[in-house]
Amino acid sequence: MIGKCLFPVAGYGTRFLPATKSMPKEMLPIVNKPLVQYGVEEAIEAGMTNCGLVTGRGKRAIADHFDISYELEHQIAGSSKEAYLGGIREVIERGVFTMVRQREMLGLGHAILTGEPLIGD
């Protein structure tokens, strides 16, 4: 059974400029969650709970999105807004997320090669 997947999310997103000048294209919202979350949710549903993400400079928002935000959760605890985090909290609890940075943007093949250590056998 395949239990690992790799998301190459290091690109510049130039086709979405100017929106991607300050926000990674993978974090652009589709309805109420970022694009990358849809792919991760599908992978986890398919049994691939070890998710490797190959990121680039300026992509810290992706790593932050798949990590617990204790300050935010504490701030909204007990309020009606707490339910908004339910979906991503479930994803975070079910998955294991590992990031590696692609130092040079040399294309998709290079991004996948950069992520090879995250996937292994």
Listing of model-derived features with the role each one plays in the protein:
Residues 18-21:
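Conserved catalytic-core motifs of eukaryotic protein kinase domains, centered on the activation segment
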Residues 26:
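Active-site mouth loops of central-metabolism enzymes
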Residues 12, 23, 58:
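A generic "binding-loop/recognition-motif" signal
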Residues 1-7, 15, 29, 33-121:
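Conserved N-terminal catalytic core of the sugar/cofactor nucleotidyltransferase
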